[in-house]
Regions:
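A cross-kingdom feature that marks ATP-driven nucleic-acid transaction machinery
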Residues: 1-89
Length: 89
């Protein structure tokens, strides 16, 4: 999963640079080890992503993150949805 996540993040940042999308990038992790793998902030807003190579694994949205940031959606990116994530403007 770590290699998959690193590749997706690198490709997403490249896509944004090529398409002149100004964005800032973060990750979020709590002391209880809940995490959001990737957070992208741009003029359209903020979105969180969790990366799972196995598309059969269900998305577990971190409850702590949702409590503190209810307006930020968290999406799952897997082998079936990665292309739309990489090319999203």
């Amino acid at each position: 999963d770590a290699l998959w996540m690193n590749w997706l993040i690198a490709e997403r940042i490249k896509w944004n640079k090529i398409n002149n999308v100004m964005a800032e990038y973060f990750f979020w992790r709590s002391h209880t080890r809940q995490q959001v793998d990737f957070i992208e902030c741009n003029v359209k807003g903020m979105e969180g992503y969790k990366f799972k190579y196995n598309k059969k694994k269900p998305l577990k949205k971190p409850p702590l993150f949702q409590n503190h940031y209810p307006d930020i959606p968290v999406h799952t990116v897997n082998t079936g949805t990665y292309f739309s994530f990489l090319t999203k403007k």
